[in-house]
Amino acid sequence: MQLSVIILNYNVRYFLELCVLSVQNAIQNIDAEIIVIDNNSQDDSCEMMKQRFPNVKLIENKENTGFPKGNNIGVSQAKGEYICILNPDTVVAEDTFTRVLTFAKKQNDLGIIGCKLIDGTGNFLPESKRGVPRPFVAFSKITGLYKIFPQTFGQYYAQHLSENKTGKVDILVGAFMLMKRELYNEIGGFDEN
């Protein structure tokens, strides 16, 4: 199996439904699986999953285990060579996984891949690529210096990369992270402490 898409859910039934629909469309030509971990939602997320998506693996936690442990539980069930950690309020384009996997296979020393994130109104989210918020970096963000002098003070949003450019960044947002499952296991997954 090439890809396992891991979606951790908590009380966002309608977003989850849209997310899973988009993932199903995006993996039609890929040997892939979808694993949904529900963190003890109080809405009808699990019922919806059972009715609408009976072929999707659903793990129902009896307590809210949090982001790190919830995702670790999902990855422990994954069979794909690659895993994608995906937030339930994310909708992916039909070619997302094909393009990202093609890119990943061309890399010699692959770490974690993020992607360009767009909000519900079609605007680019600068959180897609970030720098480490060291004191000076945080200061330039809070004071707005990064907007005035992006090349000098734009490290918070990794503004050395334009929104459509590919490159290395220090931090990826947790909404979409793709990596080899072997790497995830090698680093011990997410820190649960």
Specify the residue positions occupied by each region the protein language model found:
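Short aromatic/hydrophobic "clamp" motif used to bind/position activated sugar donors
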Residues: 83
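Short beta-strand/loop segment that forms part of the nucleotide-sugar
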Residues: 31-40, 59-61
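A conserved acidic beta->alpha catalytic loop
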Residues: 22, 38-47, 63
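Conserved donor NDP-sugar-binding/catalytic core segment of glycosyltransferases
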Residues: 91-128
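Short, acidic, metal-binding catalytic loop of nucleotide-sugar glycosyltransferases
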Residues: 21-31
